[in-house]
Amino acid sequence: IHEEKKKLADMSLHVITSMYSALSAKIPEIDRHCEQTAAYSRRIAEGMGLDETACTNAYYAGLLHEVGAVGLPDEIIQKSSLTEEQYEIYQTYVSRGYRIIRELQIADEVAEAVRYHRGNYDGSSYLEGRSGKNIPVLARILSVADYADRHARWGETAEEISQKLEERKETRFDPECAEQMRAILNPADQQQE
C-alpha cells in the first residue's frame, strides 16, 4: 500500500509539473511566485509552532495555489484590471485549483488551503462567508504569504508590505499569520521588541 501511495504521489507531482509548464507560458514568473509563496507559507507555519506535517502541507499549498489558473482565458490572466464579468471568471481559479488537487489525491489540508486562501478573515469575501478560525489555518497562512510575495513582485518594499499587513489584520488577514509574515519581512524590528 505504501508503494502504491508513493507512485500516486509521484504521478500527481508529474501532472502538476506539466500543468505549471503550460501555465508558465501564459504567466511569466509563476514558478518563482509559487516557490516564494511556498517558502513563506512554511516559515509562517513554523513560526506559529505547527507540527512538521502541517508545515510541509503549508509549503505544498503555497507551491500549488495557482494551479487552477491553468483554465483561465489569456485575456483575463494578462490584464491588471478586470471588468465585473471577467472578475467572476477569474474567481473560478480557486475552486478549479481545489478540484484539481482533490482529484490528484493530494492532502485534504492542501486542497482546503487552496480553496479558501482568497477569503478575508472577517468573512467579507466571496468564499462561503467563512470567517476567523472557521477558515482553515493553512488557508490563512497561504493568504498572507501569497499577498506578501505578490506585492513584492509589484515593487513594494518589505516595509510597505509590512504596514499593509498591519492595517489589514483582523479584516483581510489572521492577526497571528500577519505578525509572522511581518517578522519574516522585518526580522530586525522583531528583535527590538
Language model feature labels by segment:
Residues 1-8, 30:
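Heptad-repeat alpha-helical coiled-coil signal-transmission segments
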